[in-house]
Design a protein with these regions (language model features):
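Conserved N-terminal substructure of TIR/SEFIR domains
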Residues: 1-63, 146-161
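Short, glycine/charged-enriched secondary-structure capping and boundary segments
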Residues: 21-24, 79-82, 107-109
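Conserved beta-strand termini and adjacent loop/short-helix elements that scaffold enzyme active sites
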Residues: 34-37, 95, 131
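Conserved nucleotide-binding/hydrolysis micro-motifs of P-loop NTPases
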Residues: 13-15, 99-102
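Short, low-complexity, polar/charged sequence segments that are solvent-exposed and flexible
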Residues: 26-29, 84-87, 113-114
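Conserved beta-strand-loop-alpha-helix hinge of the TIR/SEFIR fold
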Residues: 57-86, 91-101
Length: 161
């Protein structure tokens, strides 16, 4: 099976180093991170520019992975990305990344599940996108060994299967 194209959603300032660990696993094909300078430039252009950037970068992706750090649930653009992914019929899942070690800050506290802030439906049926909490003793390998399976399950769920 070919690698799925993935859009990663996360809290840039707090979690970019942990996110890089996941991206560099090479298990799936993810979007390239935006540089801090580019992101600041996009933000200065306002809400519609941010939405356009997200929409453009999410296009062509089959799944959105929300990498959940300590404060991810507070980020309005993460919530926008989750809603957009679901509305577009993309696979959607979350992974707690608090036990991945950041080179600067080590690990962090487990964050609140941002999926609890949104109701997801297929037709009239309420569904719950899966949120994974990797083993605290070996989070990196747990994610690496299971990521492609988790992505396939999320894509299957979003299609109503």
């Amino acid at each position: 099976m070919s690698k799925r194209k993935i859009f990663y959603s996360f809290h840039f300032d707090n979690d970019v180093m942990r996110v890089q660990l996941v991206r560099n696993m090479g298990v799936i094909e993810g979007n390239e991170p935006v540089s801090p300078n580019t992101w600041e430039e996009i933000k200065r252009k306002g809400k519609s520019a941010i939405e356009k950037w997200i929409d453009d970068n999410m296009a062509g992706k089959s799944c959105v992975i929300v990498l959940i750090g300590e404060e991810t649930h507070k980020r309005p653009w993460v919530l926008y990305e989750m809603k957009k992914a679901w509305a577009d019929g993309k696979g959607l899942l979350g992974i707690h990344i608090h036990n991945l070690k950041c080179a600067r800050n080590g690990t962090c506290k487990k964050g609140v599940d941002p999926f609890s802030q949104i109701t997801f439906k297929i037709g009239e049926k309420i569904v719950f996108p899966k949120v994974y909490d990797p083993k605290p003793t070996d989070a990196y390998n747990d994610i690496s060994n299971n990521l492609s399976t988790w992505v396939e399950a999320a894509i299957k769920q979003s299609s109503g299967s």
